[in-house]
């Protein structure tokens, strides 16, 4: 197709493959199945959840989608709004707004280009939060700093300029800016390190510091490998630590914290089973259904479920993204 790179063509080709239903049926034996016996595609990205229906030419009531592509900056923005309970059930996500910013250049060491993407991110944050007036903002860096693919949140905190203590001490005299937001940050770690739920730590900090808004930053899981380290998702529904890899914890949401919560994430891992799906669909296209089932039963290890894959250069990429 015109305007698509070879990877995109390959992905579209295999997703329309006749081998796909058989692959998901067999993967479902090892990877957690739903009522239909099909494999649950694990993704934190609302845009990927929406694409499941698009591929089947199904419109979901209560889900609105807007797409925009900035050709000059090579930035694609997709806004998914879930407006009804029906839409939330179909998408498997809470009602709210999900903004996805995609760009091939995100994983490259280009500071000027990252600045342009940051401006786009800032624009959407202002729309969701409203930063025209001074606000107190708590940034929560979720994830395990000892695991590279999960260290995005802590890395972001390390790169931020905190201002809450300066404002409390000196007021606006500490800056020449007319508007200065009180920024504070915390890296709550993971339960295996602290013995506490992330939500418990954040709830305590929120109760004492009383921010106007909480922004939680976390590494996510994607369905499609081409979105790894090239996509930013912003949502006003908050975030659930560990949900991308199946470690469900109490969510950081407005309902739990009694303050507006914005979730920001970048997918850094993909479920290994989806890679098998993409590879096998192309390989097995020439086999009939019975041969496909026999081959997959022999080849797919039951230990595949729960395994996640990340790019080999993720350590450098995390530095750029943060």
Regions of interest found by a model, annotated:
Residues 24-95, 108:
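N-terminal amphipathic/basic leader segments beginning at the initiator methionine
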Residues 112-174:
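N-terminal active-site beta-alpha-beta segment that forms phosphate/nucleotide-binding
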Residues 100-104, 136-147, 185-189:
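Short glycine-rich or small-residue beta-strand-to-loop segments that form or flank ligand, phosphate
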Residues 87-129:
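An N-terminal, well-structured beta->alpha segment
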Residues 176-205:
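A structural-propensity feature for long, helix-poor, extended segments
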Residues 186-187, 216-322:
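A structural signal for small-residue-enriched, beta-sheet-centric alpha/beta enzyme cores
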